[in-house]
Amino acid sequence: MSQIKALEGAEIALVAMGESQLDFHLAKSHSKKWTEVWGINAMAGITDCDRVFMMDPASRFLDSDAAGSQTGIMVDVVKSHPGPIYTCQLDERCPGLVEYPLLDVVKATKCSYFNNTIPFAIAFALYNKVAKLNLFGIDFTYKGNLHFAEAGRSCVEFWLAKCIENGMVVSVAPRSGLLDTDVPIQEKLYGYHRLEDPTLILIDEDEEFFNMGFKEYSRLMEEKQKADGEVVMTVNTPPEAKRY
């Protein structure tokens, strides 16, 4: 499969089933738009997705209940979604399935480290030269299998590092623990977090890094709040009308 020209320079929302998917729905309610929305597995049954990544064979959902409570919604997805649904094997019962371009992606990225579905989607974005990738619902908070959660998160963060090194802008839902996004800003840098005035690393409007003390940062945020007359939000809240 050749690279998709329409994706070069695109901004993508990649949405999975974790709790921080809420940030995706809230962003939509605030009129946020993306070039395309890509869904992981059952998310395609919840919101409109331009592309779906389902790296299990469709038989896992059609011929067994191994996926638990997601089985029913996945049966609906694989039978009704027009595609493309990228997967590892075609199935005549599912017209929207497309074989994932595994060899093309591996050759282009020089890596074959894929231990769950999400890295396949991230690598696909890298392969197609996506400019900005926004991640929602990718939290790896599985309580029943901590090893799977830790291994999956590390693989995802590895691929995000490759994307960042290649110039892609990566954004993570504020409720997600991915890349320590939900860690308080004054606790993100180990060691420095123990100082009386913890050091922060920030990014300016020109996407250049700079450092600042937490006390100065807090003062500036307080001044901005007073000047703007509103709370500076880091997490979207339900939208409200200007006039009632």
PLM segments and residue spans:
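Metal-ion/cofactor- or nucleotide/acyl-coenzyme-handling active-site neighborhoods
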Residues: 1-244
